[in-house]
């Protein structure tokens, strides 16, 4: 992909095996986050093919790519900070627990059924991350490390096949980073998740990633 004649990512080619914890490293400006934006439909590639489980998802809309099975977190936390912890997770559940606008406005039986299912699933995910006791708090009131966990929980709520983590340890102290490493391993094992990780913390990368690709200018 190019921006104004500047080639941002060129001849990038990786294959990630199911259940693998894969690291993507390189200096700032090498194109790591741009690759995430290509994989998730924020940008459309000028050339090349992106496949998920053999399905060509190149150029699809972000929402369709998410429905196909790719979810992500962001380098800068992007929670809905004026919503509760539980409601943040429920946002991620709407793709798989839909009800129509009319059902929501008129509060028809399906609306209450789906909302109950989403409440239960959201609490299950929050419990996995030890966030169930904070379910009714505003997301903005969580400590930084727990906000990172909440962002991962919200991504998992979309039921992805591939989870993209963009610098999840950014801004964390050593204790929080160690806890995050344990969390990422746990997520991979519990959910049989395939994970692609961007990170500058080499201790974290070398501690959990099974394979690495290095980007350079």
Where are the predicted features?
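Glycine-rich phosphate-binding loops of nucleotide-dependent enzymes
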Residues: 1-217
